[in-house]
A protein has these predicted regions:
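AlphaC helix of the eukaryotic protein kinase fold
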Residues: 44-61
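Activation segment signature within eukaryotic-like protein kinase domains
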Residues: 110-111
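Conserved N-lobe ATP-binding subsite of Hanks-type protein kinase domains
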Residues: 25
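Protein kinase catalytic-loop region centered on the HRD/HxD motif
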Residues: 116-128
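A short, aromatic-enriched beta-strand patch in the conserved N-lobe beta-sheet
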Residues: 72-73
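C-terminal lobe helix-coil module of Hanks-type protein kinase domains
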Residues: 172-257
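Conserved short submotifs of the Hanks-type protein kinase catalytic core
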Residues: 77-91, 95
Length: 315
């Protein structure tokens, strides 16, 4: 493990650890020559890492604002280091832990952005299967943009493969086929997106893969359309899930549009109610003033009609 102040490749100063996972450790580093910051991933070579450059080889040909670039790769001793764009922000996991469950509109916006990124991966030829969609791999930038990080277990889709050669997944978000019983495909990522939506909706990860499928695990206030989307995403059988991320994205946009319309209507209703209450208040104030003036006039008339008796002293 590297320490703060260590120098890599004669120009990168280690500032701190950004994250640590099964495939390596990511450090925030500063280029001591140019002064800019980078995220550098350290992967230790061992017998498990058959293709230590698999992640770099997948990312190098990609060009999407929601995917970090790899700008350099170098070796130190027995380790490989990948220099990537540094994303200033926080993970979705950190955001939810700090703020709790999210509103429908924000859930849909994050999911929509994620669908755009994952859809881009699936549209590559051959398709790239991300396989590790989870809150800690989703970055929310300071500009409210979504960035997908850590392609450590991503793979190129192979038509001729029957099952995954290596079981690689994150418990709670991985599809059934990732546990060695089948082959990862585009629907594998759709499953992960469904679990991610459930996480944002509940404010906590699912305890089991079955949990989001059961109606009893949803509170009455939860959006019905979003429940339908989640349940379709996380079906056990691949054939029962959405056929593509594009189809899922379309449903999310429908929910977002409907939610915005409801918010707009609610806003108009509140504005109307506020206006009516203001009008009623004005009328009541007017009636009060009339009543007060009438009362005051009555008092004055009484005074005018009252005989004033002045006592006279008799000497």
């Amino acid at each position: 493990m590297l320490n703060s102040g260590d120098i890599l490749d004669e120009k990168y100063e280690v500032i701190k650890i950004l994250g640590k996972g099964g495939m390596g450790t990511v450090y925030l580093c500063k280029n001591i020559i140019l002064g800019n910051f980078w995220a550098i991933k350290e992967v230790i070579r061992n017998t498990k890492n058959i293709d230590i450059l698999a992640e770099a080889n997948i990312i190098k040909g990609l060009n999407h604002p929601g995917i970090r670039r790899i700008v350099n790769v170098f070796y130190v001793n027995n380790n490989v280091y990948m220099v990537q764009d540094y994303v200033d922000g926080q993970t979705l996991k950190e955001f939810v832990e700090a703020n709790g469950r999210m509103q429908i509109e924000k859930i849909c916006r994050i999911t929509s952005d994620l669908c755009d990124i994952v859809g881009y991966l699936h549209n590559q030829n051959p398709a790239i299967i991300y396989r590790d969609i989870k809150p800690s791999n989703i970055m929310i930038t300071t500009g409210e943009k979504i960035v997908l990080i850590d392609f450590g277990i991503s793979k190129i889709y192979k038509n001729d493969a029957v099952v995954d050669t290596v079981c690689a997944c994150s418990n709670g978000y991985a599809a059934p086929e990732q546990y060695g019983a089948g082959k990862s495909c585009t629907q594998t990522d759709i499953y992960g997106i469904g679990m991610l939506i459930y996480f944002m909706l509940k404010g906590r990860p699912p305890f089991t893969g079955i949990e989001p499928l059961l109606e009893e695990n949803y509170e009455t206030y939860i959006n019905e359309n979003l429940k339908i989307v989640i349940k379709k995403c996380v079906k056990i059988d691949i054939k029962d899930r959405y056929t593509s991320v594009k189809a899922l994205h379309k449903e999310i946009l429908k929910i977002l549009k409907k939610d915005k319309s409801q918010i707009s209507v609610q806003g108009k209703v509140k504005k109307t109610v506020k206006g009516v209450l203001g009008f009623i208040g004005a009328i009541l104030a007017y009636i009060y003033i009339l009543h007060w003036n009438k009362k005051e006039s009555t008092v004055m008339n009484t005074i005018d009609r009252t005989e004033i008796v002045v006592p006279i002293e008799v000497h």
